[in-house]
Amino acid sequence: MSDLSDSGLPPVQRVVTGHDANGRAIFKSGDVTPTRMIPSGDASFLLIWTTETVPADNNDETDGRLRDAGLTLNQGSVIRIVDMLPGKQSPMHRTNSIDYGIVLDGEIELELEDGAKKTVRQGGIIIQRGTNHLWRNTSNRVCR
């Protein structure tokens, strides 16, 4: 197992499936990888998977983690783990994408451009539809 993530939380297990030459389901890869701090120092990220197109080409053998992806991937999809540190927040921002935020641990506050706020706790899901927003961890625990 890998070291702790830069956030102090455990590393992330990733399991990827695919098909063998006979078309039968197989495990293509499995790894345990820690999140790593981003330059701003307010969160640590781990890219899990990307696709170049939607719908995805499941015959593409590229490891989706190895694609060059920014916060979004035009015409494709991106999934990443974000660990937001206690007392930290992102800048107000907007992406031309639909983002699905699933709170696995802790809690996060979502603030919209008009100052409206919602706190989402463990097990909660945010469907972020391209609005101007910021993320804030008001707790004393890391939020994943």
Give the predicted meaning of each segment.
Residues S90-M92, L110-E111, T119, H133-S139:
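Short beta-strand His + acidic residue motifs that chelate non-heme Fe in jelly-roll/DSBH
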Residues V32-P34, E61-R65, S77-N96, R129-H133:
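Conserved short histidine dyad/triad with adjacent acidic residue
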Residues D114-T131:
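Short acidic-glycine-tyrosine-enriched beta hairpin
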